[in-house]
């Protein structure tokens, strides 16, 4: 008898659907997750405007939109990525958010105190307390949406595919690009980049989004709703009637305190310390890690 070559068994059919194979690409996953959030956001605003009377539209649409963004993100991660959404886990969420908010307030005060001492920032009077409540829903939406998008979608997916360092570069570039419209200076670009690195490092440390959400919310709320200091070029009318004057490198000019030298020093130090802590904890990913 002549020897014969064993015939290999037939290959198992690829049961993975084509759309799921496409969604495995990092950029496609980022796009799909972003669309899930944007659609939820748009739908929530449309429903609120059609269902609620105009006098309630100040707060409720932003609060509902924040929840809708989180739901859109959760739905994508749970149904498409088919995993437990641990970064939005409820256990300990309030405590983590509060720690982040405390850190955001600390960074804000460290930024503003030297400006107040130098006479760059001045308190000219006391207004009514309505901005403290009116601006809270808007700042909550901003912090939730941006952290879900930049840290939860872009950084997380890029990190899984290309490692932490490349993901840091990509997510920071997107965060800075989103804040470019307006009268932003080079210092403002650097402050925005440093803040993005700090927010991302906070996510890396905990692998949850509550800490950076708290930091982001507190920073924006403190300056806009309390001290009446422009945030990212947006005019602010807060509880305290404050004003900024002096050289632009200190006051930040029209862009606000986020383009000042003190903010750059504070955020650069915060980013360095948080990134070092994340690295020391072994939370830098060097290579591809598949999602569950």
List PLM regions with ranges.
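Juxtamembrane interface helix immediately N-terminal to a transmembrane segment
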Residues: 25-26
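Long, hydrophobic/aromatic N-terminal blocks
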Residues: 103, 107-143
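Membrane-helix interface linkers and caps
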Residues: 2-22, 44-101, 116-127, 278-285
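Hydrophobic H-region at the start of alpha-helical membrane spans
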Residues: 32-33, 61-66, 102-106, 260-267
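Hydrophobic core positions of alpha-helical segments in small-molecule transporters
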Residues: 91, 100-103, 170-171, 214-215
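Transmembrane helix-loop-helix hairpins at the membrane interface
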Residues: 2-19, 29-30, 34, 38-41, ...
């Amino acid at each position: 008898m002549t020897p014969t070559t064993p015939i290999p068994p037939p290959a198992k059919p690829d049961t993975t659907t084509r759309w799921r194979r496409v969604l495995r690409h990092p950029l496609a996953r980022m796009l799909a997750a972003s669309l899930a959030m944007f659609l939820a956001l748009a739908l929530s605003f449309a429903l609120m405007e059609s269902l609620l009377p105009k006098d309630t539209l100040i707060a409720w649409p932003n609060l509902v939109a924040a929840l809708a963004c989180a739901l859109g993100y959760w739905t994508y991660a749970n149904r498409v990525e088919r995993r437990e959404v641990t970064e939005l886990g409820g256990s300990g969420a309030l405590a983590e958010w509060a720690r982040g908010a405390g850190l955001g307030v600390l960074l804000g005060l460290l930024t503003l105190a030297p400006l107040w001492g130098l006479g760059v920032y001045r308190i000219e009077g006391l207004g009514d307390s309505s901005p403290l409540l009116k601006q809270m829903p808007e700042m909550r939406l901003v912090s939730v949406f941006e952290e879900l998008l930049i840290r939860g979608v872009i950084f997380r997916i890029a990190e899984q595919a290309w490692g932490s360092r490349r993901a840091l570069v990509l997510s920071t570039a997107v965060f800075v690009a989103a804040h470019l419209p307006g009268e932003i200076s080079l210092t403002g670009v650097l402050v925005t980049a440093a803040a993005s690195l700090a927010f991302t490092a906070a996510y890396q440390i905990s692998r949850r989004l509550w800490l950076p959400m708290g930091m982001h919310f507190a920073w924006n709320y403190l300056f806009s709703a309390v001290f009446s200091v422009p945030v990212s070029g947006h005019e602010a009318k807060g509880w305290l009637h404050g004003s900024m004057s002096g050289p632009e490198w200190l006051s930040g000019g029209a862009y606000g305190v986020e383009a000042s030298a003190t903010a750059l020093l504070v955020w650069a130090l915060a980013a360095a310390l948080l990134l070092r802590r994340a690295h020391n904890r072994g939370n830098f990913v060097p290579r591809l890690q598949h999602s569950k």
